[in-house]
Design a protein with these regions (language model features):
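C-terminal structural segments of small proteins and small subunits
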Residues: 49-78
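Alpha-helical interaction segments
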Residues: 4, 15, 26, 54, ...
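Feature detects long, helix-prone N-terminal segments enriched in hydrophobes
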Residues: 11-13
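A short, structured beta-strand/loop element
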Residues: 15-51
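Negatively charged, low-complexity tracts enriched in Asp/Glu with abundant Ser/Thr
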Residues: 1-9
Length: 78
């Protein structure tokens, strides 16, 4: 599970084997984990992350979208 980025309490990472899903990023904090599709950006799931933290994570996904997408494709060789 490679970590791509850390910002504040958030860790942005991929799981190594999720072949049937579009480009996405998992975002974890101490409360749980949420997942965002990267292009276009959309919340794909949330397990325990407080709503205000989900919004903050989404803002960070927008801010780092280019990096996250590049790292996703680099890792998954697409």
């Amino acid at each position: 599970m490679p970590t791509v980025l850390r910002v504040g309490s958030f860790r942005f990472h991929f799981y190594s084997h999720e072949p049937n899903e579009p480009a996405h990023i998992h975002v974890r904090n101490s409360d749980g984990e949420c997942k965002f599709w990267i292009d276009p950006i959309q919340l794909a799931g949330n397990k325990g992350v407080a709503p205000h933290d989900v919004r903050q994570a989404e803002r960070l996904v927008f801010e780092y979208q280019t990096l996250l997408l590049a790292k996703y494709h680099e890792y998954h060789r697409r």
